[in-house]
Amino acid sequence: ALYEIHIDNNGDAVEDVTFQFDFKQTLNSIEIPSGGPSNVAIPLSNAGDASNPANVQTSESYGVTMVKGDRRSGARTPLGNFNKPFDYIGTKSFADYPGYARGFIQPLNLGTCGAGKVFVGQRAESFAIDLGRVFDLINLNPLGPRDGGTNVLADKNITSIAMEIPKACLVNAAQVDLGNNKRGVDPVIGAWTTASVRQATLVNPSPASGISTTAKKGGAWTQVSRLGMPLVNEVVIGLKDKDKFNASEPKDDVANFKNYVFYPTLPALIQKLYPSAPAPTNFPRQDLVTAFLTGVPTINKPANKALVPADMLRLNTTTPTVVAASQNDLGVIGGDTAGFPNGRRPGDDVTDVSLRVAMGVLCHAGLPPEATCVPADAKAGTAPFTDGVVKSATAFDSVFPYLKTPNAGSR
């Protein structure tokens, strides 16, 4: 698969900068004597200390390319080929996995805009949510204690793609009208990720020994997954349109999916399940358009007067950062404008924020009615909706790549 991080830096819902990650797996078959006439290949991933590449049967590498303009036809700059650390099999295979993994943080030369870093590898899952209960008809105590649920992802690992990129490499350098008789560089960017696979797969009925011999893949890269704002495809987009959303581009969101934001079903479902929490009544839901499609005025809305509403994670790159110990995990609605939906920090509780925004918290935020709505439109808008799971910003590392060491597979 081809994994891509896209940046829109002028508000037209089209990528201006893309970072592409293309992966390759290599076999290093380890064969040992076992009493027969010849050595025999072992079935395990490693034979001894897995921090020594000679003891590991497979390795994975990836190439990073920066594309300016259209993701397929734009100007391409290869940034290098790097190795990915082997997953944390267990404490017998790795005596010091944190130290081993740190050796795979790689520098990136981004030309005149500066230098960055990249790390691709296994990390502890940072997302916290009571997932099973959310999808069991929101089988929660939505007005109960914020830490009263179970984080079902607490013992899970993920493969993470982490980048540290200078702001100068991401923002548009053009001078634009910033309002109030000011001109300058628009500091707001929008970001989303995609995964693409080759359009055709031919399965080999008689694969040879080796690796990746079971199929031949070819044709154009075809997008099969997309993520901008968290939980949009999971709890906003209707079931029949989930594949369509995954294959779509942000510039087409209004044409394809506007009714899911204008007339969302989640608040109606919450009201049906919990009658004491009436759904907002302002239709179309301009407050959700502001939160999910355009950005919040004065916080993370692009300066482009012809802004194209689209699902992406928007960030004002000039917002001062807040140290972990002082962060409010409710982000903007908690008074911390450096948090979600102005970007997304690892410790931000995007589930609680999304629930509260869906139920109309922005109607009580004092923003202009044309940007959101008024308090009378959302009678339950100030209710502290929660899935009962929290995660502190101080639970993460203070240095890149910030996400914690993965859980050992042998635990």
Where are these regions (language model features)?
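Surface-exposed extracytoplasmic segments
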Residues: 1-411
